[in-house]
Structures are given as C-alpha cells and as structure tokens.
C-alpha cells in the first residue's frame, strides 16, 4: 500500500509539473521577429547593447551565460579582436542553448564588427568572404567599419544579400552575391528551416520581412564628407559616428570621450545625425544614466549602455517587451 501511495504521489507531482510547464509555455511572450533589436526598432523603442572592443570570449559556455544578458543585443567585436569564426560559431551555439530570453526570443541579437574597411567597392568585394562566414554562424547583423564611400556601402549591402531578394534592385543596388551554403548552420541557430532562413536572411527595413540589421561606422573625415550619399544606399538600418576614431581623424585625439566636445566634433555628430534622420536611418550613440533621456530626445535609437542606464531608458519610453 505504501508503494502505491508513493507511485501516486510521484504521478501527481509529474502531472503538476507538466501542467505548470504547459501554462508557462502558453503565457510566454511570442515574438514577431527572430531579431529582438529589429523588433524593438520596429516598435519605435530604443535599443541598448553591450560589448567590448577587446572582444567577446567566444565559447559555448560564455554564450550560454550571455543568453540572459540585460542588453537587447551583443556587439561582438572582430575588428580589433581576433577574427575567429569558429569561436563565434561556438558562442552562437551557447546562446541558443541558454535561451530563450525573457522576451521570448531564441537568443539576444548579435551584431558583429567585421574587420573590413569601407574604403571603396573593390576593397569590400575582395573581403566579402568575411561577411559570408560570419553570417553562416547565425548572427543577426553586421557593421561596416570606416564606411567612407557610397560605392563601398553598396558593395557591402550586395555582399550580405542572397540573390533571391529583389527589393532595392531598382534603386541602384545590384542583386545579392551571398551564396546559399552557409544557410544550414545559421538556420539551426535561428531555429528555422533552411528555406525559412533564406527567406528571412535579408536587410531590414529594405525588406520588411528581413531579419538582418546592417550598420555603418561613419567614423572618420572621409565618411563624414560622404555621410549623406552613404546613407542614401538602400539596405542600411543604422549608423554611428564613432567619436573615438572620428576625433583622431579630425585632429583632436581624445575628444570623443565624456564631457564637452570641441566644436568640430559637435558639428560632425550633428551632420551624421541629420543625415540619418533625412534618410530614415537609426542613429547610434553611447548613453549613460545621466544623459540617456536627453540622447533619446535627440533621436538616438541605439547605443551601448549600462544596466542602470537601460533601466532608465526602458521606463522612460514605456517599453512593453519583457526584459
């Protein structure tokens, strides 16, 4: 009789667990997009990221740990840190294993700084293999560094697109040059079929159904001079003005930090912000607890921010997506 009671007790506990899990699954958020940062931008909500220019520990364990990170997206630096695609792939696998996020997304968004300078179209095309290998790991976006020339930006957009996507081809773009054979590994990270991945792996908002965010670093005097033309290229979602490198390029090294900036730096920021607004491109700038509300009011929609700053920003804009 005692054994029967134990069996019934175990069965009852198991049923309760199943019911609890079913209720939790039913109540879990149901994201509209794979890319959390993109979904927030679509909602008109600012996006906050974390990451170091010294690089991210590219390992499965670190990815699993970062799956529940406070930030909306992770900036994975390969511009100044080693270009190690295998480590990035392991990190993405860890993120998927540690998910879903509190917002219901399979992973946080990951955007990679790839070590390709947008000097000209030929340079970008010669190094497009880097974009292809990075995208095959399942990341959600790429930043083109030192995006100096509109031809380079155009080549960048074409390099990351599959040729099946035709939006913008009638507006100066050529068809995409990305090959299909990296789709299978990326699809596993996104949790979709290869066909679904190919349909979704495109530049948003150029393609309203796309899930990739393409950004520009307009971070030197050459990019500054061409900012308006660079941002007219279809397919770019966001841009930053890179105050650290910009200050070096403009001859005022160290002026990109906190505090009052020289007039030449203020003018550079204002020009790039205005060009972003004119071309409906989201503007990226760093934020801290003291200035985050003013930055948002000024039009900043993405940026690195501490957990304290993100709490202030999210409450100020009345974000509804769980975090």
Language-model segments: what does each one mean?
Residues 1-7:
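N-terminal secretory signal peptides that target proteins for export/translocation
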Residues 10-22:
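Bacterial N-terminal signal peptides
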Residues 25-323:
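Expand to "…catalyze enediolate/carbanion chemistry for C-C bond making/breaking, isomerization
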């Amino acid at each position: 009789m005692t054994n029967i009671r134990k069996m019934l007790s175990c069965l009852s506990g198991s049923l309760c667990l199943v019911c609890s899990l079913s209720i939790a699954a039913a109540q879990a958020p149901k994201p509209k997009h794979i890319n959390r940062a993109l979904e927030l931008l679509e909602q008109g909500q600012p996006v906050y990221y974390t990451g170091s220019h010294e690089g991210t520990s590219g390992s499965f364990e670190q990815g699993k740990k970062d799956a529940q990170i406070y930030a909306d997206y992770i900036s994975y630096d390969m511009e100044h840190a080693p270009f190690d695609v295998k480590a990035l792939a392991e990190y993405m696998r860890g993120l998927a294993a540690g998910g879903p996020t509190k917002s219901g997304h399979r992973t946080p968004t990951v955007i990679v700084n790839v070590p390709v300078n947008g000097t000209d179209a030929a340079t970008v095309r010669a190094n497009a293999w880097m974009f292809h290998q990075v995208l095959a790991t399942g990341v959600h976006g790429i930043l083109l560094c030192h995006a100096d020339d509109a031809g380079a930006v155009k080549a960048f957009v074409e390099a990351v697109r599959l040729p099946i996507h035709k939006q913008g081809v009638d507006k100066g773009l050529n068809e995409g040059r990305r090959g299909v054979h990296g789709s299978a590994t990326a699809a596993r990270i996104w949790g979709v079929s290869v066909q679904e991945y190919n349909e979704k792996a495109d530049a948003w908002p150029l393609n309203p159904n796309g899930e990739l965010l393409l950004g520009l670093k307009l971070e030197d005097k050459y990019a500054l001079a061409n900012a308006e033309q660079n941002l007219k290229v279809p397919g770019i979602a966001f841009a930053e003005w890179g105050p650290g490198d910009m200050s070096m390029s403009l001859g005022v090294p160290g002026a990109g930090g906190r505090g009052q900036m020289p007039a030449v730096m203020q003018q550079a920021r204002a020009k790039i912000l205005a060009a972003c607004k004119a071309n409906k491109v989201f503007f990226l700038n760093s934020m801290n607890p003291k200035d985050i509300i003013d930055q948002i009011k000024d039009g900043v929609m993405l940026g690195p921010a501490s957990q304290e700053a993100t709490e202030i920003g999210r409450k100020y804009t009345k974000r509804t997506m769980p975090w």
